[in-house]
């Protein structure tokens, strides 16, 4: 957000945005027309602890569940799947994360990303093939979620039969994606 503030201060035009991971979140919010002040309010009100938490805040738990805090280290998804033991796909499923991402997206519903106020692309990684997946359309919140799914921490996002994780694995700085969008000058932020 800080870089965007400086670009606005010096009136540097932003013709397109390509983002990965946290860059996909900030990029999508800005590309969809959210002002930096609006972003600051939403991002400032987010507790990182709650963002990546799957259970309600402690004060909302019954006394019995509160005592579990002292006896249970974590509660991963464990179960049987076709007779085989299966484990969760990440420490968190990303449900809370998706809620916040929907707040950060001014564009609701399905979009061609070239039709946003600023053309936008997000990069995720196909967990099966190991290749980059560049999103040119979709629901912004879902696309941001896929691009931010850190393997092992947040469960992969499922899209069109693919399991997608954080784009940083294949395109930490999606400069080539920005060039393919027509950018002559690229300002890359890591």
Language-model-detected regions and their locations in the chain:
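Patatin-like phospholipase
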Residues: 1-20, 28-190
